[in-house]
Amino acid sequence: MNNKGRTPGSAGRTVRSSAQQNGLTMRKRDMTPTRNTNLLPNATFVGDRFLGVRLDQDELDHANHLMTSKLYSNKENLNNSMSEPNSPEKKSVEGEALKQMMRHKSTGALTDADDGDRILCYKKNLAPPPAIGYINQAKVLYSTNSVINPASSVKKSTRHVKETATKVLDGPGLTKDLYSRHLDWGCHNWVAVALGHELYLWNTETCVIKNLFEDNAPTNEGLITSVRWSQEGRYISLGYASGAVKIYDPNRPKTTEYVRELRTLRVGGASRCASIAWRKQGVMTCGYKSGDIVNHDVRISQHVVSSWGGDNGHCRDVTALEWSADENMCVSGSSDRTAKIWDGRHVRGSTVIQDPEPMFTIDEHTGQVRTAQFCSFRDGILATGGGINDGTVKLWDVKRQFQKVRELNVCETGGVGGIVFNRPYSEMLTASDDGFLRIYRFNANYKLSHEIQASNEPIMDLVGSPFDEVLIGDMEETLKVFQLFNVDKSTNILDRTAPKNVGLNVR
């Protein structure tokens, strides 16, 4: 037997500890790190963490001076080896490469970070600022500058929208009719509200409320079916179920009954005026139940100057009327599921054509065209909203032969009650029969940015103020004001002061 390498007396025996002899099992304890991998063959070892000690800047400068000094360079060029001689030129090139490598290592490459990661700067001054327009994709881990460029490091947050109504008023007697216009907001911050036969005026700044008729409202014309302020905000026109249209001056003192009524406009055979739109210079456009659209010049006694109807017009109620900002076009929506765009350049004068053909007819809605609006911040964009069984808003480009730009599915359980455009934020607001207000951004995708439940009942009316507030009227007979487009009042160019000498000569 070969007993080489064994101690005397250990041949054929197994050495056991006293604990094993007594039947005890020794608990495995943690072991300290070791370089002997044979003890733990299945273990995975990680290299020791090295903490480098950075020298002072003075010592680094001194070392750099020694490497770049002329004396060091001369010594480096000497050949002191006993092997193959080296030329001074070759040694000089190798020494220069070594110096450049050591210099690079001594100035910032001592970490595992990438070149783009700005971790530490071993200079007395901060790193030089990047060039204008440069987008740095590096991760800024540490910075001594408290001000960071927000364009590259701070994510732009979406604006906050206040989803609760700022003012809520009761509107007893608000007619539950989806195809009548009960509200309008004038340019001098007066809101006109039709409650049955009465008309109330409410100033949203002073909270003053007054009755236009002072409990002597005319009842022989039926219910009020449409309300509209003139463009300069001095006169208000009311359409009635009988087809009559009355013009009032709210600022005129009431000394006798109906003295605030300036005149009444009637058209033979017309009934139920549900839509009114004012132009400049005293021209008022009215839509009737018969489908006819009549242009009235309120400054002259023979007020009917032109009409759009007949075989080229609508065959049912005209429910929406709006003029473009330049007054070259007028859009009308009807219960016959069509919207027509009319040429507004020949409304009055010698060039008037009675019952002309419309410029374009939109017939892609599956329900009544309940609302229509020209975009206030993007020229040439028209929005039409469908009624019951439609629930869509369709956007049209009038400059491209009324090509459809986008179709938005606003409401699946009802129609669209109103459309308001907001210029400061370039957004579109819609109200629908499901009680929701929806804000869409006018970008490439027309993205839905906010959805607000404004009511538990269908919203019948949606109007916007000249100061970026909105007012809704719902079937709960309530009026609610929302501040969805708050802007800095110091930058608001609109003047809230009403001009004193602006008006029309209404005969």
Swiss-Prot record:
Protein location: Chromosome; Cytoplasm
Keyword list, A-Z: Cell cycle, Cell division, Chromosome, Cytoplasm, Meiosis, Mitosis, Repeat, WD repeat
Pfam families: WD40_CDC20-Fz
One GO BP: asymmetric cell division
Highest taxon of source: Eukaryota
Effect of a null allele: RNAi-mediated knockdown causes embryonic lethality. Embryos are arrested at the metaphase-anaphase transition of meiosis I and lack formation of polar bodies. In addition, causes a loss of asymmetric cell division and par-2 mislocalization in the one-cell embryo followed by an arrest at the one-cell stage.
One Gene Ontology cellular component annotation held by this UniProt entry: cytoplasm
Keyword Chloroplast on entry: no
Function per UniProt: Plays a role in metaphase-anaphase transition during meiosis I. Required for embryonic anterior-posterior axis formation.
Similarity field: Belongs to the WD repeat CDC20/Fizzy family.
Protein's name in the database: WD repeat-containing protein fzy-1
Organism: Caenorhabditis elegans
